[in-house]
Amino acid sequence: MSVTEGRLNPVDQAVISQALLSAAREMGIKLYRSAYSPIVRDGKDASTGILDAEGNAVAQSDELIPMLVGSLSITFRSCAALYPVATLKEGDFYICNHPYHGAHHLQDILIFVPIFHDGTIIGFSAAVAHHLDVGGGAPGLNSTATDFYQEGLVIPPSKYNLAADWNDEGPLRRFIGANIRVPEQTLGDIDSQFAACAVGAARVREMCDKYSATTVRRAMAEMIAYTERRVRAAIAAI
């Protein structure tokens, strides 16, 4: 890899950028094709993306709902403020659906999985999905709710571990399932979110093996900087 003044040459940047976008798209396909509920499987009311180690959005699936990606960085930072990234271990994840901490509404559950490479966090794979039911006073969306506690189960910014808390009927899985009218579909869709995040993490690790973790991080930073330049130019032209 040839790097000039900390930036990759245009060819390397383009190749890695497209690989990151492809990984985000593959995450989206994995999510909706493995989902249980029609709202995700058919309606595709979900989104997936890859964040850098600070929680900045780098790439997103353009086959799902782009608007949902807007909540990723805000919700991520709410989780990281309570559970710093430096404390995360392999298998840990963030989860949240709290509207006051970045989520759109309680039906949108966000999951963030750290991407480790040689013991270092390179970034995060993220998935958000609108769930068919999250409890509350009525199935689905409660149109008679007078406060958001009536809308369903509130998951504040939290950190859990996949093996200890979710897999094999772990305590978090059982707790969420006990508050849901259709646990098979809601839990199945959360499983699909984890599966999508696993795909994203695997693809980023493959890039790190091929190009080096330093190079991938530089490519992520340049994607964000390039987007900022484009947006600033568009605003300046108004």
Task: Please identify what each model-predicted range represents.
Residues R7-V11, L31, Q60-D62, R181-Q185, ...:
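Glycine- and acidic
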